[in-house]
Structures are given as structure tokens and as C-alpha cells.
Design a protein with these regions (language model features):
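Electropositive, glycine- and tryptophan-enriched low-complexity nucleic-acid-binding patches
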Residues: 58, 113-168, 264-269
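Long, acidic, intrinsically disordered low-complexity segments
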Residues: 249-290
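Active-site-proximal, Lys/Arg-enriched surface segment
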Residues: 60-137
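An internal, acidic/charged active-site-proximal segment
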Residues: 144-252
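A short, flexible helix-boundary coil/loop motif
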Residues: 1-6, 11-20, 139, 143, ...
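Short amphipathic alpha-helical "interface-anchor" segments enriched in bulky aromatics
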Residues: 278-312
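Gly/serine-rich nucleotide phosphate-binding loop at the start of the catalytic core
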Residues: 1-58
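Short, conserved catalytic/metal-binding motifs centered on acidic residues
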Residues: 43, 87-97, 126, 169-177, ...
Length: 349
């Protein structure tokens, strides 16, 4: 069981002054205690002193503390508790609908989850995930919608988490099926990477994978995986084939196909490329399922702790709010039982 006080001490260890540690804890406790939208006014009221509203507002949007240091402490805290080598990083895009353009980074963009154009923010989040736990760690707000913007955001996040932890946990990137142009070229060399790609991306595969070719053909990933799926007994709805990018680059790679319902047949629903060493198909399949769990965490606990609730034009304010809301998510995930007992005790009193 994780003690909440010890958890806060670990998260806020890099704040230089006691005042910042107090404000950070107030803000996180307010995020955990407020029902409904997590405005600064509601957060201040939840922690018992509405007069703290201006102090908390300045702490988030006007103070000089580094959100990177807090994110680093959050990453260190959750990976240490998971145990050496356990877990993976998951990089996932999210859409945050907003009413009007009064907040930073608001654009009109297509939201795959809602299957329509929405007005709101687009962001990428880096989450730490094990089979039991999920915690958001770091964020990038997109200021444009081009592929270049998205690739840059992915690259920054992958580089960041690799540097913060200094380990080689796999990084799973599901940026909405980016084509493989240069999804994360430099970070690919720093940590094992698994990237969801467009099913039509060309891969160099062994001749026996695609019938009728004497030399190593270049085939669409979905075709190669459909062929190998017919030739082998796939595990839990996944099949793999050794592959390489025709133009060279990182390698050797494994292409992974994922089929719905646990049965291989026809065109795969998802295609992934991986350089995770010595990974079995079932292990790669487990990694490929992590983004769905993260998306569920974003919709449920993420909404409950206010990850989508920041209002304001300050980009530093957005980053600080997202970081503190990520800390609130971690506290609820790691010490939720203790929180419930505290709430029950308050209600009984």
C-alpha cells in the first residue's frame, strides 16, 4: 500500500520552497476533491479557503516553477514503484473539446473518436503503463495539424522519457497511424520502440511471405501480415513477420498485425513496427493493447481529475495544470484505497 504523504513528498521533492509544495498539494487535493469541472475557484473552495483562489491561479499560470522537474519526479516515482524493467511508455494523441477560442491552442480539427470536426485542443501524452497501472507523465500541446507537428511532438516525448528514466523500457507510439517517414528517428536508437503505422506502408520481407516472388519483395504491411497469418498459428489474434523499411533505417524490425476478436483472418485491424528485442508475438500483442487501455484511462480517471479542464491563454499555465492533474491521477491510481478511507471518514464525521 502506498502512503499518500510519502507519495506527495516524492512527487514534490524538487520544489525549492515550502510554499510551492503547499500550493501543489492544495491543487492536487482540490482536483481529487472537486465534483464537476476543475476550475481554480472550485479547487480553492474544495481545499477549504476560497481566498486561496488568486494564490492558486498565480501558482499555475504566473509562477516560475518548472513543470519538467515535476514530470521527471513523477516519472521517477511511478517507475520505481513498478520495479526495474517492468512496464512501458505509451504515447497517445488526445482531443480536448472547448467552447470558443478562449483557451490556448484551440483549433478546428478532426477528432477520430467522435468521427467529426471539433473545436478544441490537440495534444500528445506520454503515459507509463504496466498490466495493472496507468499514469500520465508528460504532455505536448499541438499548435498546428501537420504531420511535421505531430512527428515533432512524438519525438520530443519519446526523447524526454528515455532521458528521464535512463532505462530501456519499450515505448509504444500510437499517433493515429502515422506513415513511417521519420516517426521518431533519433529516439529509436535510445530505447526499444513500437510504432503503429499505416497498413499500406511498404515493407521488405522474405520471399516466402509473399507467394510468387523469387527475391525479397516490397509488399504492403497488411498483405505481408495476411499471408503470414495464413501460414502460421497466430497467438491471441496477432501475427508477426520479420521486415525492414525499403529505404533502410532502423532495423531489424518486426511487423505485427492485430486482428479483432482474437482470430486471424483477412486484413489486420492494426499494423505495428517494432524493434523490441527477442519479443514473442504474444508480448508484442500485449504492448499493442496498451494504447486502448490508456485511451480508457484518459476518458475515465483522466476526466475525473481534470486533465481536460484547463481554461486560459497561458501555455505555461496549461503545462502546469496538465502536470498537476497527472500527479492527481497518480495519487488516485497508486493510493486510491487510502483516499477512499479518508473520504469515508470525513463523511462519517
Amino acid at each position: 500500500m502506498t502512503d499518500i504523504s510519502e507519495l506527495y513528498a516524492s512527487l514534490f521533492t524538487d520544489f525549492r520552497g515550502a510554499t510551492h509544495r503547499v500550493r501543489a498539494r492544495q491543487y492536487v487535493e482540490g482536483l481529487l476533491g472537486v465534483d464537476g469541472r476543475k476550475t481554480v475557484a472550485n479547487i480553492a473552495a474544495a481545499v477549504g479557503d476560497p481566498q486561496d483562489e488568486q494564490r492558486l491561479r498565480r501558482f499555475v499560470s504566473g509562477a516560475a516553477w518548472s513543470w519538467d522537474l515535476l514530470r521527471r519526479a513523477l516519472a521517477r516515482t511511478v517507475t520505481t514503484r513498478a520495479g526495474e524493467g517492468r512496464g512501458a511508455w505509451v504515447v497517445l494523441p488526445v482531443s480536448i473539446p472547448k467552447n470558443g477560442d478562449r483557451s490556448v491552442g484551440v483549433t478546428r480539427h478532426y477528432c477520430p473518436e467522435r468521427e467529426r470536426v471539433v473545436v478544441g485542443q490537440q495534444a500528445f501524452g506520454a503515459w507509463f503503463a504496466t498490466q495493472e497501472r496507468l499514469v500520465p507523465i508528460s504532455w505536448r500541446l499541438l499548435r498546428g495539424s501537420s504531420e511535421t507537428d505531430r512527428v515533432a511532438a512524438v519525438r520530443e516525448l519519446v526523447t524526454e522519457v528515455a532521458e528521464w528514466t535512463g532505462d530501456r523500457r519499450p515505448v509504444v507510439v500510437d499517433p493515429g497511424a502515422l506513415p513511417v517517414t521519420d516517426p521518431a528517428r533519433q529516439p529509436w536508437e535510445r530505447c526499444p520502440l513500437m510504432v503503429r503505422v499505416d497498413a499500406g506502408v511498404g515493407l521488405a520481407v522474405a520471399p516466402q511471405v509473399v507467394p510468387g516472388h523469387a527475391a525479397a519483395p516490397v509488399a504492403p504491411a497488411s498483405q505481408a501480415l495476411t499471408s503470414v497469418g495464413r501460414l502460421s498459428v497466430a497467438s491471441r489474434g496477432v501475427a508477426t513477420v520479420p521486415a525492414a523499411l525499403p529505404a533502410g533505417g532502423p532495423g531489424p524490425l518486426t511487423a505485427l498485425g492485430v486482428w479483432p476478436g482474437g482470430r486471424v483472418g483477412g486484413r489486420p485491424e492494426e499494423v505495428w513496427l517494432s524493434d523490441v528485442p527477442a519479443a514473442r508475438p504474444a508480448s508484442l500483442g500485449a504492448l499493442a493493447r496498451l494504447p486502448r487501455r490508456v485511451a480508457g484511462g484518459w476518458r475515465t480517471r483522466g476526466a475525473a481529475v481534470g486533465l481536460a479542464d484547463f481554461e486560459g491563454r497561458s501555455l505555461p499555465g496549461w503545462h502546469r495544470h496538465m502536470t498537476l492533474a497527472s500527479c492527481a491521477y497518480a495519487v488516485d491510481e497508486l493510493a486510491g484505497d487510502q483516499l477512499e478511507r479518508q473520504r469515508s471518514g470525513l463523511c462519517a464525521a
